[in-house]
From Swiss-Prot:
Encoding gene, per UniProt annotation: UGT72D1
Keywords of the record: Glycosyltransferase, Transferase
InterPro entries, per the entry: UDP_glucos_trans, UDP_glycos_trans_CS
EC id: 2.4.1.-
UniProt source species: Arabidopsis thaliana (Mouse-ear cress)
Name of protein: UDP-glycosyltransferase 72D1
Family, per entry: Belongs to the UDP-glycosyltransferase family.
Lineage, uppermost ranks: Eukaryota, Viridiplantae, Streptophyta, Embryophyta, Tracheophyta
GO molecular function, one term: UDP-glycosyltransferase activity
Keyword Transferase: yes
Region forming the signal peptide: none
Length: 470
């Protein structure tokens, strides 16, 4: 009898590729099924993207096939957002994905797409697959907002940002103006319309896999299943199978970061990393540096060249270091280290000396921190990170955050220092509660994936439903 075969399709960009790769690894290793990942590349021949795919192929038990994306410049407005371009790319990839599936010797029976690829679900019907699912690599609150967005679109007048009251999501935490995703800020824009369309298409799947777990978001998951209004919109089963995060990779060669961390006290270092797209303005970089210095805490800072906050530009050491305050590196020598190249985030967060994480709050990064019991200083920059920061601080209680969004004003050095001390200083009462909660979440994350844990059982419930396991 042939081994069951699942097909996963990853949208362009590392932020979408990595969660799909990790999901594929989990499905293959836990369920003992064959997994093929179609990785739609960005089309920019990015060395980082290519390296990530090749590295993943080397360590994964999944089969990975790259599909170059098509040029869609003639299909979008000149000022189209990155989100819009990616959605249009995925729409245009339908023939290529269909052809790739038809060429497979071992036919997949189940297709899984991400939120950007919901239009590809029709391919599953075209080629005779038995089931099609959507994977949401972020949390249940995000899923609830997305599937309820078409309802909001019909009942709310005007721009959401102009409404003083938070948007009500049945059975869930309301969404305030400061939590709105960028895609929701302009209702006349194409990216908003694409979000509404996807919100309608998600319930047309056979179910949704979401990267959270019952103990973390039980109330929101219950609302998706049981709330009279929200469950009527959701329509299909929701399977919480998280946390699914990158696992530790052994660092073979000597690494100055870990040599330095080995010399530090347990839980005494704050790790600062704002993600692959986390570049700051020059002024904000200076204030963050001086705030770290003022805090008196030890730090590891992964720093990128200042740009607009959506810059995502890396550069060489000299250019990055030139953006720091004069004398900063000399004054903090021995207290902190500044890293200007890629750094192994999961391995750093796993180190015993790390006691806090100043993060952009991408959900993958947040989970990497929470599964290690490391509390977070929330520094949201874009996309759904504003929602994530609120969830981490107000709902889960494992983070502190800036008084205003960093995208709206420069966060001063005094506030930076205060936030760092709150998480790192042993005597801070609020920090003690946050650290205790972070440890509680770490334990619950391990429990969720233990045998007969909530996520373990949820995955097997899904696999049985689509005949991937007996």
């Amino acid at each position: 009898m042939d081994q069951p075969h699942a097909l996963l399709v990853a949208s362009p960009g590392l932020g979408h590729l990595i969660p799909i790769l990790e999901l594929g690894n989990r499905l293959s290793s836990v369920l003992n099924i064959h997994v093929t990942i179609l990785a739609v590349t960005s089309g920019s021949s990015s060395p980082t993207e290519t390296e990530a795919i090749h590295a993943a192929a080397a360590r994964t038990i999944c089969q990975i096939t790259e599909i170059p994306s098509v040029d869609v410049d003639n299909l979008v407005e000149p000022d189209a957002t990155i989100f819009t371009k990616m959605v249009v790319k995925m729409r245009a990839m339908k023939p290529a994905v269909r052809d790739a599936v038809k060429l497979m010797k071992r036919k997949p029976t189940v297709m899984i797409v991400d939120f950007l690829g919901t239009e590809l679900m029709s391919v599953a019907d075209d080629v005779g697959m038995t089931a099609k699912y959507v994977y949401v690599p972020t949390h249940a609150w995000f899923l609830a907002v997305m599937v309820y967005l078409p309802v909001l679109d019909t009942v709310v007048e005007g721009e959401y940002v102009d409404i003083k009251e938070p948007l009500k999501i049945p059975g869930c935490k309301p969404v305030g103006p400061k939590e709105l995703m960028e895609t929701m800020l302009d209702r006349s824009g194409q990216q908003y319309k694409e979000c509404v369309r996807a919100g309608l298409e998600v319930p047309m799947s056979d179910g949704v896999l979401v990267n959270t777990w019952e103990e973390l978001q039980g109330n929101t998951l219950a609302a998706l299943r049981e709330d009279e209004e929200l469950s009527r919109v959701m329509k299909v089963p929701v399977y919480p199978i998280g946390p699914i995060v990158r696992t530790n990779q052994h660092v073979d060669k000597p690494n100055s970061i870990f040599e330095w961390l080995d010399e530090q006290r347990e839980r005494s270092v704050v790790f600062v990393c704002l993600g692959s797209g986390g570049t700051l303005t020059f002024e904000q970089t200076v204030e963050l540096a001086l705030g770290l210095e003022l805090s008196g805490q030890r730090f590891v800072w992964v720093l990128r060249r200042p740009a607009s906050y959506l810059g995502a530009i890396s550069s060489d050491d000299e250019q990055v270091s030139a953006s720091l305050p004069e004398g900063f590196l000399d004054r903090t020598r021995g207290v902190g280290i500044v890293v200007t190249q890629w750094a192994p985030q999961v391995e750093i967060l796993s180190h015993r000396s790390i006691g806090g994480f100043l993060s952009h709050c991408g959900w993958s990064s947040a989970l990497e921190s929470l599964t290690k019991g490391v509390p977070i200083i929330a520094w949201p920059l874009y996309a759904e990170q504003w929602m994530n920061a609120t969830l981490l601080t107000e709902e889960i209680g494992v983070a502190v955050r800036t008084s205003e969004l960093p995208s709206e004003r420069v966060i001063g050095r005094e506030e930076v220092a205060s936030l760092v001390r709150k998480i790192m200083a042993e005597e801070d009462e609020e920090g003690q509660k946050i650290r205790a909660k972070a440890e509680e979440v770490r334990v619950s994350s391990e429990r969720a994936w233990s045998k007969d844990g909530s996520s373990y059982n949820s995955l097997f419930e899904w696999a049985k439903r689509c005949y991937l396991v007996p």
